[in-house]
């Protein structure tokens, strides 16, 4: 590897503010914020809008999309068009 062209790979804390959840991992992300972690060391901090702790897919709080209304509207339009074409021909 060439020297001086690769970003620093270091421990970083990612915090999901919405879920009040943080985890320590390694990353090359750049940030000016820091946080004191549970082990007493200070690490760079990256604030997240969403993570597996708050995403509906991972938490099981998914919103079910009601497609029944769409299907019913489509079927009613189809029936009307069939009736119109049946009356004409």
UniProtKB/Swiss-Prot annotation:
InterPro entries, alphabetized: Ribosomal_bL28/bL31-like_sf, Ribosomal_bL31, Ribosomal_bL31_B, Ribosomal_bL31_sf
NCBIfam families documented for this protein: L31, PRK01678.1
Region of interest (Disordered), ranges: 70-89
Protein name (Swiss-Prot/TrEMBL): Large ribosomal subunit protein bL31B
Native source species: Rubrobacter xylanophilus (strain DSM 9941 / JCM 11954 / NBRC 16129 / PRD-1)
Keyword Ribosomal protein among record annotations: yes
CC terms in the record's Gene Ontology section: ribonucleoprotein complex; ribosome
Subunit field text: Part of the 50S ribosomal subunit.
Alphabetical list of SUPFAM superfamilies matching this protein: L28p-like
HAMAP family in the record: Ribosomal_bL31_2 (MF_00502)
N-terminal signal peptide: none
GO MF assignments: structural constituent of ribosome
Family: Belongs to the bacterial ribosomal protein bL31 family. Type B subfamily.
Keywords recorded for this protein, A-Z: Ribonucleoprotein, Ribosomal protein
An individual GO BP term: translation
């Amino acid at each position: 590897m060439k020297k001086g062209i690769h970003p620093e790979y270091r421990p970083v804390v990612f915090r999901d503010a919405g879920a009040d959840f943080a985890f320590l991992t390694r990353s090359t992300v750049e940030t000016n914020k820091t946080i004191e972690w549970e082990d007493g060391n200070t690490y760079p901090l990256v604030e997240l809008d969403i993570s597996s702790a708050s995403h509906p897919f991972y938490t099981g709080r998914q919103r079910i999309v009601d497609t029944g209304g769409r299907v019913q509207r489509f079927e009613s339009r189809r029936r009307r068009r069939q009736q119109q074409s049946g009356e004409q021909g």
